Amino acid sequence: MTNISVIAKPYAKAAFEFANEHNLLQQWSKLLQTFSELIKDKSVAAIVSSPTISQIEVVDALKKQLDENFFNFLALIAENKKMLIMPEIADQFESIKNIHNNVRVADVTLAYATDKNILDSLKTSLEKKFGCTIDMHINIDPAIIGGAVVKVGDTVIDSSVSGHLEKLKSILLS
């Protein structure tokens, strides 16, 4: 875990516990993602990190647009001058939420876009293999030539043509 992850985790955990207790997981998830995207914007990050404007002032400007509890959460982060780690807080919140809901993320890389039925079949197979709900994130990379590379947590399943060619090459060279 990096230093930012260590700092972000208690915020994410507190946000999750509050949102879960008050049946606000989806709402807080969206709010955290929205603020995460805002902070990733260079102009917003420049304002938040500006020595002339405090992070509290930035959050106070949003008070009327936000739910009181979410505002209080942001105010706490701003008081501790941690607004710039909002993307990490949002990511950790999603990870905690996924564990709670028995969901795992599968990063699936394909050589080209494919039929929805094939993706549904792949999702069903992965759910059986891992015993949980799978949230698939699809990436297209023509360099794999064909097939797929699936990453779920620390597990990598490489059934790509380029992966098979690399294995064949290493066998032939050994």
Swiss-Prot record:
It comes from Francisella tularensis subsp. holarctica (strain LVS). This is ATP synthase subunit delta. It is found in: Cell inner membrane. It comes from the Bacteria. Signal peptide: none annotated. Keywords: ATP synthesis, Cell inner membrane, Cell membrane, CF(1), Hydrogen ion transport, Ion transport, Membrane, Transport. F(1)F(0) ATP synthase produces ATP from ADP in the presence of a proton or sodium gradient. F-type ATPases consist of two structural domains, F(1) containing the extramembraneous catalytic core and F(0) containing the membrane proton channel, linked together by a central stalk and a peripheral stalk. During catalysis, ATP synthesis in the catalytic domain of F(1) is coupled via a rotary mechanism of the central stalk subunits to proton translocation. The keyword Ion transport applies. F-type ATPases have 2 components, F(1) - the catalytic core - and F(0) - the membrane proton channel. F(1) has five subunits: alpha(3), beta(3), gamma(1), delta(1), epsilon(1). F(0) has three main subunits: a(1), b(2) and c(10-14). The alpha and beta chains form an alternating ring which encloses part of the gamma chain. F(1) is attached to F(0) by a central stalk formed by the gamma and epsilon chains, while a peripheral stalk is formed by the delta and b chains. Gene3D superfamilies: N-terminal domain of the delta subunit of the F1F0-ATP synthase (1.10.520.20). GO terms for molecular function: proton-transporting ATP synthase activity, rotational mechanism.
